[in-house]
């Protein structure tokens, strides 16, 4: 039986209250040297839900674990059916004002880098460069046998051919690209193997129960060491993969600033948490800095 990932903290318990004052965020960016750490909350305005915010998908959806995926063919079939259907929507998501604001900060030399916990590629689509995808990307798939990486669009084409007419109506989409389907809707969905060696294909993302590659973690730690401050955008910081960088920055005496509507696990380490929607908040900050944030058509 799969276990639902659980919270190891109580949101809002004896934590500093959020504010609506964006001045500290604007001041940090004006000073430069800011490292951005983004989470699922920055993509909700693009139609991709988060895990733990209001109405988050963990309330109705148990994400696939690495252990289940690698051990059980039926779990892989269920995953790929849901992911294939979800990709039709997920793959069409477009950057929102939050992503475009981050790209504008980067273009004007205010950032030292962007680390994202998201797997949607929307920072890059908005124009951000050198983005570190902490948890990988749904744009790629990897063979667990031969290690070959291939484009997700090619797998999508092969799955379409193997499952002609597969078009159940999903109840929703999740941050990991899964569509909400029942076992009956999954039916006899056919999974395709690696085109090179016939091995098992997996999205090039870090599943629950899987570790972020050590080299990637160290690269992120280097980015924290080189930054003047850390700006967290849309992350509850519930999992250690992101929280560790907040702790590192705070221990080094670097200001940590958070923009997230709900309480986060890192609030005690931050100089401020702005409790505002990300798109409008970051657009306001950009305006204060005299920066132009491109519209959706030009992002």
Swiss-Prot record:
It is an enzyme of class 2 (transferase). The active site is at 135 (proton acceptor). Its EC number is 2.3.1.286. Gene3D superfamilies: SIR2/SIRT2 'Small Domain, TPP-binding domain. InterPro entries: DHS-like_NAD/FAD-binding_dom, NAD-dep_sirtuin_deacylases, Sirtuin, Sirtuin_cat_small_dom_sf, Sirtuin_class_II, Ssirtuin_cat_dom. It catalyses: N(6)-acetyl-L-lysyl-[protein] + NAD(+) + H2O = 2''-O-acetyl-ADP-D-ribose + nicotinamide + L-lysyl-[protein]. Binds 1 zinc ion per subunit. It comes from the Bacteria. Residues 15-292 form the Deacetylase sirtuin-type domain. It comes from Streptomyces coelicolor (strain ATCC BAA-471 / A3(2) / M145). GO terms for molecular function: histone deacetylase activity, NAD-dependent; NAD+ binding; zinc ion binding. This is NAD-dependent protein deacetylase 1. NAD(+) binds at residues 39-59, 117-120, 234-236, 278.
């Amino acid at each position: 039986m799969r276990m639902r990932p659980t919270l190891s903290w109580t949101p809002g318990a004896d934590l500093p209250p959020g504010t609506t004052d964006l001045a500290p965020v604007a001041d940090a960016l004006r000073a430069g040297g800011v490292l951005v750490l983004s989470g699922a909350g920055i993509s909700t305005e693009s139609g991709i839900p988060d895990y733990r915010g209001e109405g988050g998908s963990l309330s109705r959806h148990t994400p696939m674990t690495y252990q289940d995926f690698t051990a059980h063919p039926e779990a892989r079939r269920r995953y790929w059916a849901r992911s294939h259907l979800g990709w039709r929507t997920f793959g069409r998501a477009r950057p929102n004002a939050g992503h475009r604001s981050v790209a504008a900060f980067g273009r004007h030399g205010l950032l030292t880098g962007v680390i994202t916990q998201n797997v949607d590629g929307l920072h890059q689509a908005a124009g951000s460069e050198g983005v570190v995808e902490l948890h990988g990307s749904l744009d790629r798939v990897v063979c667990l046998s031969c290690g070959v990486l291939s484009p997700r669009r090619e797998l999508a084409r092969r799955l379409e051919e193997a499952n002609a007419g597969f078009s159940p109506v999903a109840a929703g989409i999740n941050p990991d690209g899964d569509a909400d389907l029942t076992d009956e809707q999954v039916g006899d969905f056919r999974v395709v193997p690696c085109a090179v060696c016939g091995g098992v294909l997996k999205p090039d993302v870090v599943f629950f129960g899987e570790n972020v590659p050590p080299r990637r973690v160290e690269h992120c730690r280097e980015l924290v060491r080189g930054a003047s401050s850390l700006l967290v955008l849309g992350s509850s910081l519930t999992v250690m993969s992101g929280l560790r960088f907040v702790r590192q920055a705070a221990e080094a005496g670097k200001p940590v600033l958070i923009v997230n509507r709900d309480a986060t696990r890192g609030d005690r380490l931050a100089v401020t948490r702005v409790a505002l929607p990300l798109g409008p908040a970051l657009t306001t900050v950009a305006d204060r800095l005299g920066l132009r944030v491109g519209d959706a058509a030009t992002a």
